[in-house]
Amino acid sequence: MSEPIRVLVTGAAGQIAYSLLYSIGNGSVFGKDQPIILVLLDITPMMGVLDGVLMELQDCALPLLQDVIATDKEEIAFKDLDVAVLVGSMPRREGMERKDLLKANVKIFKSQGTALEKYAKKSVKVIVVGNPANTNCLTASKSAPSIPKENFSCLTRLDHNRAKSQIALKLGVTADDVKNVIIWGNHSSTQYPDVNHAKVKLQGKEVGVYEALKDDSWLKGEFITTVQQRGAAVIKARKLSSAMSAAKAIADHIRDIWFGTPEGEFVSMGVISDGNSYGVPDDLLYSFPVVIKNKTWKFVEGLPINDFSREKMDLTAKELTEEKETAFEFLSSA
């Protein structure tokens, strides 16, 4: 057995964490021979609920779980971390301006970034899920200057998986038969789900998605809006936000960081844009296609970008630039 790793999940009393913690504990994220010390952080009013989650994790009798620690204190939660999954954030309440939401979250993610800087290992991998995820991730990274910015990523894998499954449903294949869809930009309704480079396996052969579907108007219209608005559609139907699918996407995202991406496949994640070759301004936390090896991601280079894509990629970059500017105004005063 290897040495145990310390993994933190914040917002640990919430819906997404409830669906995620079992996957982490049973070895399907970090492997079946990797012992784990699982740290659960939430705000003080949630400690009663968190206690129940702690009891359930103990009752799962998972052989890889060496210890489970539930706390409301950052200095305990962030100590010596190998991985931090930042799920907790201030949810948007009815009638709340996006600006107010940003302000509340800048405070949270500045504090958590500072705690990472102070207590965590410098090699820690940080995955931000709490919305607005891209800007929250950038805020945390800026607040932890001695941790490499490449170690910070945010979740756009849920959008990526949604795009894959929409294509699969349309073609009557399984999601596994579809690969190399891309989510560009912000995890918001300006994101751009791009299948210009995606492939689908049909009768044992790999075919481009555009060629396989022969339905450009659907691919440039309804497909994009369905993926962009899927989160809202789930809330409308379920009266709660996506939890099971979000937890599955987080597990996919972390597993790929840990073990690398399969040969010939790339995935989408929000990462720092510095040095990209797609004309996205530097110093944004933007979703790109990446490949991962030895726990290090690299941009997928050299994909041709048509005018339709360019416009959509620029639009979401513009939104992220505005979010960043608003957040940084608050950051200096937070």
Curated annotation (Swiss-Prot):
Keyword annotations: Acetylation, Cytoplasm, Methylation, NAD, Oxidoreductase, Phosphoprotein, Tricarboxylic acid cycle, Ubl conjugation
List of residues that carry N6-acetyllysine: K118, K121, K298
N-acetylserine: residues bearing it: S2
Keyword DNA damage part of the UniProt annotation: no
Quaternary organization: Homodimer.
Localization in the cell: Cytoplasm, Cytosol
One biological process term in Gene Ontology: NADP metabolic process
Residues that, per the record, bind substrate: R92, R98, N131, R162
Residues with the Phosphoserine modification: S217, S241, S309, S332, S333
PTM annotation, UniProt: ISGylated. Acetylation at Lys-118 dramatically enhances enzymatic activity and promotes adipogenic differentiation.
Family per record: Belongs to the LDH/MDH superfamily. MDH type 2 family.
Function statement: Catalyzes the reduction of aromatic alpha-keto acids in the presence of NADH. Plays essential roles in the malate-aspartate shuttle and the tricarboxylic acid cycle, important in mitochondrial NADH supply for oxidative phosphorylation. Catalyzes the reduction of 2-oxoglutarate to 2-hydroxyglutarate, leading to elevated reactive oxygen species (ROS).
Gene that this polypeptide is encoded by: Mdh1
Binding site for NAD(+): G11, A12, A13, G14, Q15, I16, A17, D42, N105, Q112, V129, G130, N131
Protein name: Malate dehydrogenase, cytoplasmic
